[in-house]
Amino acid sequence: MFTSTLLAAATTPLQWSPTVGLIIIIANIIAIAFGKSTIKYPNAEPALPSSNLFGGFGLPALLATTAFGHILGVGAVLGLHNLGRI
């Protein structure tokens, strides 16, 4: 009886699709734009090889903004999946 209750509560897993990738990319762009305006020392050492290509960010700022973007993106993807939109 307990097993049937667990099976009834199980959700369908979300498969990766280009829509999921696009949501993660958009979330990363938003996070980088947010980081560009709020990080106090965006060009802290160690520097990236072509800092102009990365918006003048150093390695710590780039890692921080992309990590934040992935957190935002995963939250958006899981929320939209829970709502049944994707």
Swiss-Prot record:
Annotated keywords: Membrane, Photosynthesis, Photosystem I, Thylakoid, Transmembrane, Transmembrane helix
Q: Give yes or no: UniProt keyword Thylakoid.
A: yes
Biological-process GO terms, alphabetical: photosynthesis
Subcellular location as annotated: Cellular thylakoid membrane
* Membrane topology per record: Multi-pass membrane protein
TM annotation in the entry: 14-34, 57-77
Q: Name one Pfam family in it.
A: PSI_PSAK
Please indicate if the UniProt record lists Membrane as a keyword: yes
Q: Which GO terms describe its cellular component?
A: photosystem I; plasma membrane-derived thylakoid membrane
Tell me, in one coarse class, where this protein mainly resides: membrane
Could you tell me which NCBIfam families the record lists for this protein? PS_I_psaK
Q: Which family does it belong to?
A: Belongs to the PsaG/PsaK family.
Q: What is this protein called?
A: Photosystem I reaction center subunit PsaK
Report the gene name: psaK
